[in-house]
Amino acid sequence: MVSLLPWSACRPLLLALLLPLSLSAQGAATGRIAGRIFNPATQEYVRNAEVSVEGTNLLVFSGDDGSYLLTNVPAGEVALAVAYTGYDRASARLTVPAGGTATRDFELRGSTFRPGARPAAGDAVVTLDKFVVSNEREGNAKAIMEQRAALNFKSVVASDNFGDVTGGNIGEFMKYMPGVVMDYVDADARAVRISGLDPKYATVSVDGMRMATAASASFGGGSRQFEFEQASITSIESIELNKTLTASMDADAPAGTMNLRSKNAFERKGREVTAQASLTASPYEFTLRRTPSPGDGVHRKIRPGFVFTYADSFQGRFGVQLSLSSNSLFNEQSGLTQTIDNNTARGPVINALVFRDNPKITTRAALGVNLDYRVTPHLIASLRTAFSHFNDEINARTLTFRANTADIDPSSTATSLLARATANANTRFEQNIGHSHKFNDTVTYTPKLEYRRHELQLTLGGGYSRSTTHYEDRRTGYFTGANNRLTRMSWSARRSSPTSTDWQLTQLSGPAWSNLANYNRVDANPNNIGTVDRSGTSQVFLGYLDAKRALLAAGLPVTVQAGVKTRLTTYDLNRTGTRSWTYVGAAGDQLNPSTVMIAHTYPGLFDPKQGDNLAALNLPIPNTTAMLDLFRSQPSQFVENTYNNFLIERTTGRAIKEQVDAAYVEFNTRWRDVRLNLGVRRERTRTVGRTFDILPAPLVRAAGYTPNTIPFLAYQYRNFVRFNKYGGYEHDFLSGGAKYSLARNLVLQLSANQSIGRPDYNNLAGVITVNDNNQTVQVPNPDLKPETSDKYYASVQYYIEPAGTLSVSAYRLNVRNLGVANRPVPAEEVGYADDPEYTGYTFLRPSNLDGVRRLKGVEVEYSQQLVFLPGFARGFSVFGSVSRAIPDLRLTNIVPKAANGGIRFSNHRFNLQLRSTWSSARATSIGVNQAQWQYERLMFDVSGGLKLGSTYEFTLSGRNILNSPNRGYADEPGNLRINMYYGAVWTLGLRGRF
């Protein structure tokens, strides 16, 4: 499917290359100024320093290696100025030869900001009595200059700005960026919301290379979102958050893009080696002993970690940046979910209490190798490589107390439940003991050739990224699930208040739940042994060519940039779903008294930590490892769910290929204090989905096949041959912006861009899903249109010396063809008009909303170094942001309000910072009978360090230090639905810098 771009797509690039030939690129009365900017205090070349020729419109920002080039400079004597936040403005006078190049290097010496101090004149350098390098201040200065250089709306944060990140998860770092809220899956920061929007509207790249993501080996609505568990922060120098796009950026990010900039050895002089060893612990298991869980064995809960980095630049010709890390941490995941029936005459009724005890051990490892080689003074070859491994071992253990609403005694209240016994399985106690391993391996290669000579810059690059996620159980020694049921019994539960979780459970009648031999006795419990071993692989192939040229047009400096790009994304899902068996024992009968599951080695292990009495009840639970051993040695004691397992094995594989070809042209210029950007981009999208062409059930029955048999399936799925479904579309995207310097440190910025949101993969290559319990049929929609949007952004930014900022921003996003999931459609519209099997079922299909939907919002960001305070208080700094998102219709998972911030203190030996995030309540599900909400959540983190001389430093970091739970409610805040605790995570380390 990979093909070259059409001739029409290459025209902008050729135009950009040929246009300067008809204009003045370097007049006879002009010359060039070149040089590099270096900071001797940090031993780094300075990126994004502002270099200008006074009295002209000529201004550039230094590159990654600190180099700069000013073209079309009037010949003769000129005044050159260099500005960088937190440092004195430097200037120099030099003579520019006509048609030639003058060279001038600069060194920044010390953070020279003092309240009331005047800038140095000429080449003079202001020197403080004592200068101490502050990683925080230098990191903030880099971020501010990156933001000032950008013509789109961009926020940048250095990776060491918030101290050590527990577990190395980039998501735990990004949650402190303005306008960002993390989506958590239990204890893990999994995906990012920008301006409150769904994670699928944001893209993630490393050095501009789109990272592949296998999205939990699923093909659902989140198949396009990036999951942060597959990336590590170890080799990352800074994170760029672009909330508006330029023509050179991919257009499929209505919310914005995140680019992880890796470290570059050419950005510094000399060699740097760092090594760090650490231990991570949870207060729930603060012991050096091996203790039970996760799984059926014992593990140490205080886990080790290490980080090693090496950087060197050999004579400025060859640069090496190596990073290697590994860490492991233990997390508790304990909670309660209450099922609430709102569709009753007596009001809401709780008819199920689901307690969870899901401890897990997460291990991450990462390797980054970055190589740069200066082939000639004008040509640089580079290779960026990143490898990451993720291993998550988790126990998904649940105990459920259940009854039909009609069997909940009328005397029951929100704090007192009485479940009456029934002569069937309606009132019961369930055990579902799960155990699984999730693995992810991701690799990314990004080669690049960059040629710079005078006014011309050419970049030829490409890349390959592969992400594979797979879930295992049997191969690693256990079943995913073992389900037990105790029926024909009754139970009661009491708690202290309607919003508390301290349920006290009591068995009122029936066989004792403390004896595993009483389970699965009278009422059949089919398919009570399960396994899930699914896998998915995503790959991204990328190639691009960019050209940039500086010229003079109508007396104004103009930069013309154009490029072509092609990206192929593939996603293959090999298998999904749960295969199952019924445990019937040696007697061949599940209901026989001798058919008893093997008990867990450690009785009384289950503890949901909700203030309940479950741990004291000492309830036995099955041992999934021993049950798999029995399955392997005595397979006759397990009866396979043949039809269902065959269905999953043969029909759940799916595949999609998507190729996006793009071409763009972009213009930048400056007139006095105004910088302008204008561009246009064209993208052509082609898709191929490999899926089944399923025959309607009435046709299969009419052909003489019996439902729920394998021959029926084979005929319905056309002998399991998958067919290609093709699709495609083209769009043009405009973008532009302006920055106006109202004063030296006061900027007004306007920015706008058009973008696209492509349909989820499950619509391009999905299958029909039937839910007999809810009587629904979900049908994919391969004809779903892509969403298109227009975004407008306005911002006022004030830069506070030495390295702070205050900004107020507002935005508006207009979306056409907004996609919504599962709207009811007539049965005949999806081919089920004559199928009596689904009479009374509701058919659901994703669709596009008519008209334009609007989302508007505001964001306020503030950070400041409090250097104006006296004495030691000069070491304090503060930061924070507040955001508000307002959609014009009720949408799920939009975060309407969010805030983050913190306070930091640092001096030459000690640093400490306390940070917090807050997000308001949000709707997570809106149904006909019930709306489910997540409560507001406030979390605190802490990090710090103590230097032992100039080489070593003790480090400390804590995540969610107050153990803030994740809580949800149904309809009203007083109807608690879910409460989950994950515990704090603390890391103590020793770092050396050599």
Positions of predicted regions on the chain:
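Periplasmic N-terminal accessory/gating domains of Gram-negative outer-membrane beta-barrel systems
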Residues: D88, G100, E107-R109, R114-A202, ...
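Short, acidic Ser/Thr/Gly-rich low-complexity loop/linker segments typical of extracellular
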Residues: T56-S67, T71
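Solvent-exposed loop segments that connect transmembrane elements
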Residues: S334-F355, N395-I433, Y478-I529, T582-A599, ...
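Transmembrane beta-barrel wall of Gram-negative outer-membrane proteins
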Residues: D296-T405, E430, H437-H454, L734-G737
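Conserved C-terminal beta-signal and adjacent last beta-strands/turns
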Residues: I529-V532, G536, Y544-L552, P557-Q561, ...
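Gram-negative outer-membrane beta-barrel transporters
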Residues: S807-V815, G819-P826, V830-R922
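Short loop/turn motifs that connect adjacent beta-strands in outer-membrane beta-barrel proteins
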Residues: A124-V126, A265-R271, F314-F318, H378, ...
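Outer-membrane beta-barrel signature, preferentially recognizing the C-terminal barrel domain
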Residues: T427-T444, I648, T652-D661, Y726-G727, ...
